[in-house]
């Protein structure tokens, strides 16, 4: 792509050539369709527009030094989308169909996969919408599955550099037994006000506390949180956190590095004991945290005392990216090569 400066890409939408679509009607999924239009034609009474019957996923494709294109853990995204469907009574898309759609959309748009080590990747966005004209609150009779792609740079402007986050108890991203564990748009809509306030104050994200008691660490903006203390990788266990595929992968890599992995409720007072902390997810990969400001208690916790990423975060980041780009062996079968 001669007109794209790969190293200067932000995390935004750039038009590509094709997307994939599939419809669920009369109790079954149809065939995958290739489309070049960016526009979806849906009825104004569709449940996705009124009652939030919508779910989505996010994954990436990487071009390796060998020129091959690799997609990271798409089977996990397929299974998580099924979980989201169960959570809001949508039709479940078979894992095989999800994977076929991803393979096809990446292959059709392979000229948009950024070159090796440009710092950019091809972001893949699967999306499911409830269709069918209804005014009452009930599950949709029909569904549309869409996958589009766009080349992206780092999610955070600083890239792999520590940034500040804040705690604000006034806001929650999900209810205690609500939809926090699934990937639906409502969770992100609920985070917009707090997120904008945080950005206006100069923070990269909000570190939420649990919505029930406000005692434990929860999600960190649109990503999972983890802390490093000594030889331990510590990440929250909660009924309102999305199970991050990146976090799951990092836990395995941490164990491979000899760290003890702890998944448990983390009292927010433990922040003061962390040697390192970060948020992690498909979009951010790993975004180290330099400082956590508790705006309600007027306290600051400095994590990165020298202003640089910690050694464990840096090792995990380099290891994960090396697997994604094919620079290190894929010992766990996480990568799919697009032929």
Where are these regions (language model features)?
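Extended, Lys/Arg-enriched charged tracts that mediate electrostatic binding to polyanionic substrates
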Residues: 115-129
């Amino acid at each position: 792509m001669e007109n794209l400066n790969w190293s200067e890409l932000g995390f935004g939408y750039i038009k590509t050539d094709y997307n994939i679509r599939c419809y669920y009607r009369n109790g079954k999924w149809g065939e995958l369709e290739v489309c070049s239009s960016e526009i979806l034609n849906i009825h104004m009474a569709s449940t996705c527009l009124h009652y939030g019957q919508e779910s989505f996923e996010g994954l990436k494709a990487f071009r390796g030094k060998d020129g091959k294109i690799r997609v990271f853990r798409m089977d996990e995204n397929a299974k998580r989308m099924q979980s989201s469907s169960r959570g809001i009574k949508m039709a479940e898309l078979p894992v095989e169909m999800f994977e076929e759609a991803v393979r096809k959309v990446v292959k059709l748009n392979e000229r948009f996969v950024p070159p090796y080590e440009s710092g950019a990747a091809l972001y893949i966005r699967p999306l499911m919408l409830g269709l069918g004209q209804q005014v009452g609150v009930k599950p949709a009779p029909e569904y549309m599955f869409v996958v589009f792609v766009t080349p992206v740079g780092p999610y955070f402007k600083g890239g792999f550099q520590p940034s500040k986050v804040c705690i604000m108890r006034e806001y929650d991203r999900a209810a205690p037994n609500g939809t926090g564990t699934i990937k639906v748009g409502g969770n992100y809509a609920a985070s917009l006000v707090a997120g904008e306030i945080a950005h206006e104050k100069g923070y990269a994200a909000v570190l939420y506390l649990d919505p029930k008691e406000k005692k434990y660490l929860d999600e960190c903006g649109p990503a999972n949180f983890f802390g490093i203390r000594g030889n331990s990788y510590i990440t929250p266990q909660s009924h309102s956190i999305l199970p991050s595929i990146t976090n799951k992968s990092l836990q395995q890599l941490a164990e491979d590095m000899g760290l003890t992995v702890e998944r448990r409720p983390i009292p927010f007072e433990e922040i003061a004991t962390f040697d390192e902390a970060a948020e992690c997810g498909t979009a951010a990969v790993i975004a180290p945290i330099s400082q956590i400001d508790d705006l309600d208690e007027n306290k600051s916790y400095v994590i990165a005392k020298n202003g640089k990423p910690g050694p464990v975060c840096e090792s995990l980041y380099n290891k994960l990216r090396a697997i994604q780009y094919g620079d290190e062996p894929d010992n766990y079968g996480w990568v799919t090569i697009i032929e």
